[in-house]
């Protein structure tokens, strides 16, 4: 029965459970860091520059080699789903990178909708996560996944509704998962309320 559920999930989302866990972890870690603006001066020149790029949807697009390198060099690299350059091309993943900064995300076509994937911020610039998600939505993102916790309210306020929830399964835990620090949170799959399949 478990295998049947995994096959059904894969057919519906084009993801395997371990990939979903990795993406959920990264989304959670990104926002744990980027939503906190207390560490970075609100008007630092770098933050203002990054937000100007993001708010104007000004990105380097589809530079797959650079995008793959940024994911590989992320401090959360071991928790990320790494896409090879040829895989990104084959899946037609659209990548968006802030010029001059290792910040970006990808959009991946699903059978129904577009998944926000590979969200990363390899800089020390904080407080840009909300603008990054707003931009991903403007550019067509309709779905995402994350671990249950503080992001649940954030994504609800952004217009994402839960459509599926997985109980934690140790079998799919990312390598090196710190149970003492992160526990065993549910994985929540969300889509925009305005999304119509």
What are these regions (language model features)?
Residues 147-148:
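Helix N-cap/beta->alpha junction signal
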Residues 14-124, 135-143, 152-158, 165-197:
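Non-catalytic substrate-recognition and accessory regions of acyl/acetyltransferase enzymes
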Residues 1-12:
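Short, intrinsically disordered N-terminal pre-domain segments
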Residues 127-129, 133:
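Extended non-catalytic interaction/regulatory regions in multidomain proteins
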